[in-house]
């Protein structure tokens, strides 16, 4: 059984409408509970263009499939994934928090002091930025870093350890250790979708990180600065599933 819930882009998720809560509507929560009580194998298809706090919902069903509004082909796409004709491989482009209490005031746009987004939020979340499951499993191996002119070359290998082919979205993050200013806990500097990886197959993934991507704007000197010191590169399946870590020390530079 499939319970379809969520929002409608022309009714309650229009761009000019701000939500006062990230809680799922009570009626939808109750619907899923009642359906799941009759059939414990009920799957939820959540159609949403923004995050919900669905921690309680997660406890009542074995699987949740998320899709944004997909126009007239939405139903066909969901059906193909649920029947195994296609393997889901999407990733969250937003952090999904556990409750309203995890968020600052709606009018507070300071992402650093308000600890907004995966870059600064330091508590447990429901689903992290970049998260997503598929019908296969992948392992990450052998991260390598090489300095080149004006950039840092980062490569790693991923292996399909599952029993069917699927896509994997490899994500690369960086963190500046010991910065003299407040920098993100981690910052996305690259991602790549690797298509149709067969069972037991290994693929190499390479990122070219430009040095300017590691810089920040210094308000005192009024220029972009690349700090000396240690930069931690992390690769994995989401912002909190980073199985490969490597250290690099790029050459300092600054310019107006």
Question: Which functions belong to the PLM regions below?
Answer:
Residues 1-59:
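Hydrophobic helix-and-loop "lid/oligomerization" segment in the mid-to-C-terminal part
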Residues 12-18, 184-185, 217-218:
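Short acidic, glycine/proline-rich loop/turn micro-motifs
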Residues 19-21, 60-61, 171-180, 187-190:
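Active/binding-pocket-proximal capping segment
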Residues 47-167, 173-175, 183, 199-201, ...:
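Secreted, periplasmic, or luminal enzymes acting at the cell surface/secretory milieu
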Residues 181-216:
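Intrinsically disordered, low-complexity Pro/Gly/Ser/Thr-rich segments with frequent PxxP/GP/PP motifs
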Residues 213-230:
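Short glycine/proline/serine/threonine-rich loop/turn segments at secondary-structure transition edges
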Residues 236-244:
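Beta-sandwich strand segments
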Residues 245-256:
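Single conserved hydrophobic/aromatic residue that forms the stacking wall/gate
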């Amino acid at each position: 059984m499939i319970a379809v819930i969520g929002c409608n882009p022309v009714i309650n998720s229009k761009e000019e409408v701000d939500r006062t809560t990230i809680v799922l509507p009570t009626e939808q929560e109750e619907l899923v509970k009642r359906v799941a009580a009759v059939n414990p194998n009920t799957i939820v298809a959540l159609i949403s263009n923004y995050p919900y706090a669905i921690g309680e919902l997660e406890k009542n069903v074995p699987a949740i499939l998320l899709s944004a509004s997909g126009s007239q082909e939405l139903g066909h796409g969901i059906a193909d994934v649920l029947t195994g004709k296609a393997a889901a491989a999407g990733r969250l482009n937003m952090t999904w928090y556990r409750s309203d209490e995890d968020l600052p005031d709606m009018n507070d746009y300071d992402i650093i002091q308000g600890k907004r987004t995966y870059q600064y939020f330091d508590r447990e979340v429901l689903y992290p930025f970049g998260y997503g499951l598929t019908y296969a499993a992948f392992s990450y191996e052998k991260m390598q870093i090489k300095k080149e002119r004006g950039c840092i070359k980062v490569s790693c290998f991923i292996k399909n350890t599952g029993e069917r082919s699927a896509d994997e979205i490899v994500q690369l993050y960086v963190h500046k250790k010991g910065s003299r200013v407040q920098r993100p806990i981690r910052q996305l500097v690259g991602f790549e979708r690797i298509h149709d990886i067969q069972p037991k197959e290994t693929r190499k993934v390479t990122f070219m990180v430009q040095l300017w991507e590691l810089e920040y704007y210094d308000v005192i000197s009024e220029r972009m600065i690349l700090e000396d010191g240690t930069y931690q590169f992390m690769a994995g399946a989401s912002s909190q599933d980073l199985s490969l870590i490597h250290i690099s020390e790029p050459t300092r530079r600054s310019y107006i």
